[in-house]
C-alpha cells in the first residue's frame, strides 16, 4: 500500500498489477479510511487513466456474483450521475421504453447522491422490487426484457465506502466505475458522464473491457443526451472510437430549455415517468427521452440512424404499451 501511495503522490499512473492489488485490498477491507481517502484524492488530482479505470472495473467484476447467464447481447444505459442538475430520470425511463420495444435492458444502478431521484429511487417509488433475488431477476428479464441490478447487492465495497466518499466532497474513480461494473457484463452501452473530458477516457475503458458497441455522452453538462445544448459523444464502433457532437437537429427534434427537465422532488420524477409512459408527458420530457431511446435503438442496430430511432420511439409511445409494460415489470419483480 505504501508503494502505491508513493507512486500516486509522485503523479505516476499505476500499472495493472498495482491497480488490481489496490482494489483487491479495498474489497477485502484491508485499507484504512485514511488510506482510502488518500488514494482516491491522489488518483483524482493525478487524473485517472482509462487503464486504471478498466483494471479496477475488471477486479470488481471478478469479485461480484453473476446472477444468471442470459446468452444475449445485453444493453445498459447506466450513467455516472453526479451532474447535480436534478432533472427527471431520463436514462431509467428510456430503459423501460426500450425494453418494451424488445431491447434486452440490464439496468445497473443505485440510489441518488446528487439528484432528487436515482434509478433505484424511481423504480422503487414506481413499485418495482429493486432487490430481486437471482431467480426473480432472471424470470423478470426473460419475460419483460428488463432487469434491474441494484449495485450495493453486488458490490459491497461501494456500499461500505460510501460514507467516506461523501465526506471527500468530490467525485472519485468510484463515480467512473459505477457504469462499468454491471455483473451481467452488457456488450452494448449508452453511458452518460458528468464531465465532457471523461468521454474519451470512458470510451477507451469500455473498449478495454470488451464492450462491442457503445456511446459515451455528456450533454450540456449532464450525463444524458439532451436537446437544450450540444451533446458531446464518443462512439465505440468496429473497435474504433469516433468523436463528434450532436444537436437536437440530429434527432429531427426541436430544442428545449434545461429548466423544463428539472424537478423539485422524487414525487415529480415518478409522475413525469408515468406521464411519458402513458404518452401524456410534457413535450420537453417525452422528446429528450425519445432521443435517448433512439440512441439505444441505433446502438442495437434496430434503427439505421438517430432520426429513425426517434420516429420508432414516438410511434411506440402512442400505443401506451410502455405503461402496460411497467405494470408487468412491477408484477414480475415481486413474483
Swiss-Prot record:
<dbReference type="InterPro" id="IPR035902">
    <property type="entry name" value="Nuc_phospho_transferase"/>
</dbReference>
<dbReference type="Pfam" id="PF02885">
    <property type="entry name" value="Glycos_trans_3N"/>
</dbReference>
<keyword id="KW-0328">Glycosyltransferase</keyword>
<feature type="binding site">
    <location>
        <begin position="107"/>
        <end position="115"/>
    </location>
    <ligand>
        <name>5-phospho-alpha-D-ribose 1-diphosphate</name>
    </ligand>
</feature>
<comment type="function">
    <text>Catalyzes the transfer of the phosphoribosyl group of 5-phosphorylribose-1-pyrophosphate (PRPP) to anthranilate to yield N-(5'-phosphoribosyl)-anthranilate (PRA).</text>
</comment>
<feature type="binding site">
    <location>
        <position position="87"/>
    </location>
    <ligand>
        <name>5-phospho-alpha-D-ribose 1-diphosphate</name>
    </ligand>
</feature>
<keyword id="KW-0822">Tryptophan biosynthesis</keyword>
<dbReference type="InterPro" id="IPR000312">
    <property type="entry name" value="Glycosyl_Trfase_fam3"/>
</dbReference>
<keyword id="KW-0460">Magnesium</keyword>
<feature type="binding site">
    <location>
        <begin position="89"/>
        <end position="92"/>
    </location>
    <ligand>
        <name>5-phospho-alpha-D-ribose 1-diphosphate</name>
    </ligand>
</feature>
<feature type="binding site">
    <location>
        <position position="224"/>
    </location>
    <ligand>
        <name>Mg(2+) 2</name>
    </ligand>
</feature>
<feature type="binding site">
    <location>
        <position position="91"/>
    </location>
    <ligand>
        <name>Mg(2+) 1</name>
    </ligand>
</feature>
<comment type="similarity">
    <text>Belongs to the anthranilate phosphoribosyltransferase family.</text>
</comment>
<dbReference type="GO" id="GO:0000287">
    <property type="term" value="F:magnesium ion binding"/>
</dbReference>
<feature type="binding site">
    <location>
        <position position="79"/>
    </location>
    <ligand>
        <name>5-phospho-alpha-D-ribose 1-diphosphate</name>
    </ligand>
</feature>
<dbReference type="GO" id="GO:0000162">
    <property type="term" value="P:L-tryptophan biosynthetic process"/>
</dbReference>
<dbReference type="GO" id="GO:0005829">
    <property type="term" value="C:cytosol"/>
</dbReference>
<dbReference type="Pfam" id="PF00591">
    <property type="entry name" value="Glycos_transf_3"/>
</dbReference>
<keyword id="KW-0028">Amino-acid biosynthesis</keyword>
<feature type="binding site">
    <location>
        <position position="224"/>
    </location>
    <ligand>
        <name>Mg(2+) 1</name>
    </ligand>
</feature>
<dbReference type="InterPro" id="IPR017459">
    <property type="entry name" value="Glycosyl_Trfase_fam3_N_dom"/>
</dbReference>
<feature type="binding site">
    <location>
        <position position="165"/>
    </location>
    <ligand>
        <name>anthranilate 2</name>
    </ligand>
</feature>
<feature type="binding site">
    <location>
        <position position="79"/>
    </location>
    <ligand>
        <name>anthranilate 1</name>
    </ligand>
</feature>
<comment type="subunit">
    <text>Homodimer.</text>
</comment>
<keyword id="KW-0479">Metal-binding</keyword>
<dbReference type="InterPro" id="IPR036320">
    <property type="entry name" value="Glycosyl_Trfase_fam3_N_dom_sf"/>
</dbReference>
<feature type="binding site">
    <location>
        <position position="119"/>
    </location>
    <ligand>
        <name>5-phospho-alpha-D-ribose 1-diphosphate</name>
    </ligand>
</feature>
<keyword id="KW-0057">Aromatic amino acid biosynthesis</keyword>
<keyword id="KW-0808">Transferase</keyword>
<dbReference type="GO" id="GO:0004048">
    <property type="term" value="F:anthranilate phosphoribosyltransferase activity"/>
</dbReference>
<dbReference type="InterPro" id="IPR005940">
    <property type="entry name" value="Anthranilate_Pribosyl_Tfrase"/>
</dbReference>
<feature type="binding site">
    <location>
        <position position="223"/>
    </location>
    <ligand>
        <name>Mg(2+) 2</name>
    </ligand>
</feature>
<comment type="pathway">
    <text>Amino-acid biosynthesis; L-tryptophan biosynthesis; L-tryptophan from chorismate: step 2/5.</text>
</comment>
<protein>
    <recommendedName>
        <fullName>Anthranilate phosphoribosyltransferase</fullName>
        <ecNumber>2.4.2.18</ecNumber>
    </recommendedName>
</protein>
<feature type="binding site">
    <location>
        <begin position="82"/>
        <end position="83"/>
    </location>
    <ligand>
        <name>5-phospho-alpha-D-ribose 1-diphosphate</name>
    </ligand>
</feature>
